[in-house]
Amino acid sequence: MMFMVKIITRKVKDIEPLENALLIEGLPGIGHVGRLAAEHLVHEFKGEKFLELFCYDFPPQVLVKDDGTIEYMCAEFYAIREPKPMIVVLGNTQALSPIGQYHLAEEIVKIGIEYGANFVYTLGGFGVGKLCEEVKVYGATTSKELAKKLKEHDILFRTDGGGIVGAAGLMLMFADLNGIPGICLMGETPGYLIDPNAAKAVLEKFCKLENIEINMEELEKRAKGMEQFIEKIKKFEEEMLKAAQAKPPSEEDLRYIG
């Protein structure tokens, strides 16, 4: 028995299809790396929202904003015309179930093609479980020719196999099935923090691959703020460890020794 997941789209603005556009996915994932990178593209290149997508496999809730109004769980499509045509997909969630992930990825690629996309980029994080002094960027692609191009830009490939979960992986599959090339870029991240530094590393590789320039000042500010936050955590942990080591055992502690 085949289960269908209902997806609703709502046009925010009528736009003409772009020509030879890049479809760029930046939905939430590990360290919010892809989302931060894609949001930065939209912000810096004045992206224009033209479509919203709602999926019945999104979390069954709405978010409440500071002013008391609600925010839907949805994906949003933005059109960028300069420095080159792009369709950027942002959102506050991904689908919850495997079947929902498949339907969502397929629909996003379908919409991208409808609006002129002929190349797909998916952006995300590569969880390593620890802080990274220098962020490495890993990649995956739909062809050997593109893999060679990634290597020329010092983008690494996993040597232990593994998979890419969610929209970042499935959109490459649906792009390939539709005869469209695609690349996934993943920045190393601890996985337990929102990571603007990894987003910056991913965006730098993207810009080199596409031969475009972008102002990174805003991301650099966020990365600096996160570094300061991490330093505070480290300092607090060190102080706690020193205090624990310096504290003599109490009588109660001694009762349990030997």
From Swiss-Prot:
Keywords, ordered alphabetically: Membrane, Transmembrane, Transmembrane helix
Membrane topology of the entry: Single-pass membrane protein
Superkingdom, natural source: Archaea
Subcellular localization(s) per the UniProt record: Membrane
Record-level GO cellular component terms: membrane
Cited SUPFAM superfamilies: Cgl1923-like
PANTHER family linked: 3-ISOPROPYLMALATE DEHYDRATASE, 3-ISOPROPYLMALATE DEHYDRATASE-RELATED
Protein name, per record: Uncharacterized protein MJ1210
